[in-house]
Amino acid sequence: MKQQFFPQRLFMDMKRLIINRLVGLGLLVVGALVSCNAPTAFVPVPSPNPWVDDYTALSSMENYKQWGTYNVHDPACKKIGDTYYMYSTDAIFAENRKEAEEKNVPLGFIQVRKSKDLVHWDFVGWAFPEIPAPAIEWVHSQAEGKGATNIWAPFLMPYQGIYRLYYCVSAFGRNTSYIGMAESDSPEGPWIQKGCVVKTGEGDAMNAIDPSVIEDPETGKWWMHYGSYFGGLYCVELNPETGMTMQPEDHGHLIARRANYRKDNLEAPEIMYQPELGKYYLFTSYDPLMTTYNVRVAYSDSPEGPFVDFYGEDIKDTTNNVPILTAPYRFENHPGWAGTAHCGLID
């Protein structure tokens, strides 16, 4: 199987590189032992960490213009000209909407930032002034009037001078969800709502959240990947001219799932094409959002799959696929970071 060969070859190339480095290191060590009469004890030199991993002083919602990359959730980043634009979920734990209203701070919409160097970020504002009414109506109609309090997981896709901003609205913990799309002639807006791309309810296998769109460079076809632990991740073809599904009410086909969807989380597909290898890499997020959230990757010869992991296993099966690329971490003298997933790919 052709797809099984690539990771093994990559592993062997890395193995040879490590062996060569170790041989070189061994020669250096031998030379050092010959030239020294007695070993010198290593004494570490303490040095302060130049990176301050604490933004407590800026964490209040009224300081949003100073946040930089802090409080960025579910990011999507596109380079347009010489500027990087980043769109993200606006989420605050234990959010206080009364406080937000008193301080005149929008809450629950799509945050927009821009940068020239990926280091210094300017806060542009919020993409929409409100949650689109059709999304609220759909979610409320399927969830007994609950949900639809935030806009999640935006994704930007340029097309012939037009910018399409995909987003989703849902009821947390349910698959009553709505993926919508808005257009603008500027990456900073203003945006015109174009309607629903995919929507799901209690009777559907999938969950219409976390959209990610890619164009096949050979065929020009557009594919949207989306979904979550409700039924897994799906891929559906879009019409490049409209940005909507090629076939009305098409939900696409399954590309990834896990055994126990109530316990084993899976969501947030992000996909990229690597032209030198001719492969599509699908980055996904596994496990619970608040704790062991982690990023994993699979690959395919086609944007619509099938996608396989390092060992060539199709990620539609119920295997606990690897490798894990990022996971929660904690350094010494620091409380640590949890929920380090739903990655964004820099284009």
Q: Could you tell me what each predicted segment is?
A:
Residues 3-11, 36-39:
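Residue-level recognition of alpha-helix boundary/capping or hinge positions
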Residues 6-23:
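Bacterial N-terminal signal peptides that target proteins for export
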Residues 36-347:
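Carbohydrate-active catalytic/glycan-binding domains of CAZyme proteins
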Residues 23-34:
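Bacterial N-terminal signal peptides
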